[in-house]
Amino acid sequence: MNLKRTMFASGLVILIAASLAACGTSNDSENMSENGNAKQTIKVGSKDFTESLVISEIYADALEENGYIVDRVQNIASSVIPQSIEAGEVDLYPEYTGTSLLTIFDLPLETDPDKVYDLVKKEYEKNGVLTVLDYAQANDSAGIAIKTSVAEKYNIYTISDLQKNADKIRFASQGEFDQREDGLPGLKEVYGSFAFKSSTVYDNSLKYQVLLNDEADATPAYTTEGQLSNKDEFTILDDDKKFWPPYNLMPVIRQDILESNPEIKTIINNINKDLDTDTLIELNAKVDIDGEDYADVAKEYYESIK
């Protein structure tokens, strides 16, 4: 082989290798932590409904903005995701304080938000694997929605008001709500009997349309549903006797991830401090009512608060 060609080829290989190394150093520097170590890939999980998808995407956007690589692990069933994070399949995901209290840990009912948070935080940290970050004021709890016109007509703004005026109200119920202890039977124990003018069972997906069609006046609801953004049509009643526990949005994270990436606490807590119930209603409405893509909604919201 020609010696000059051999030397040229060898030099070219060295030059290419050096260039690739330089490029790698440049890219890696964007994903370096403050102590000089490369930032980890963070697996951000979500449950299989709009609100969880939007919030987890906001978390992911914030982490990427701060130099992390994010692996999105989406649409996990609510019953499965606690095991997923324990197993390391997920590093971080948005959970709810009430779900943690009653479903995950099967603890006694508590309605004070701070007490609920303290109780579940202690449970998450027991095995040294998980912990939680600050909870948001946003509360995705059970509730009762009423037509705003009816609320104004009869001065009904709390569940106590509803109980006193039940004989004027056509109730659009759902099958399980009539039997479950966290539904009508439990409400009766706390508020007294609800002698509705009428009560008809409808499919959950039809409840707001039933109210709009003037077939009923009130219905079981969740307090962050997108339809509630239409305040001219719908009003959520205040649970004035605190029958339902709070379901404040709360990030669950693996302790090992937080220990090796402590800045994640500040990144995610900065998001949660601005999240209130009305904000969640608006975010859900953009996806479920307006038909926007959840990732676009999350990106737009994150850009507005960062």
Tell me what each language-model feature is:
Residues K115-F171, Q255, K273-T277:
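A conserved helix-loop-strand patch within extracytoplasmic ligand-binding domains
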Residues A18-A22:
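C-terminal motif of bacterial Sec signal peptides marking the signal peptidase cleavage site
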Residues I104-D114, D118-L133, Q227-K241:
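Ligand-binding "clamshell"
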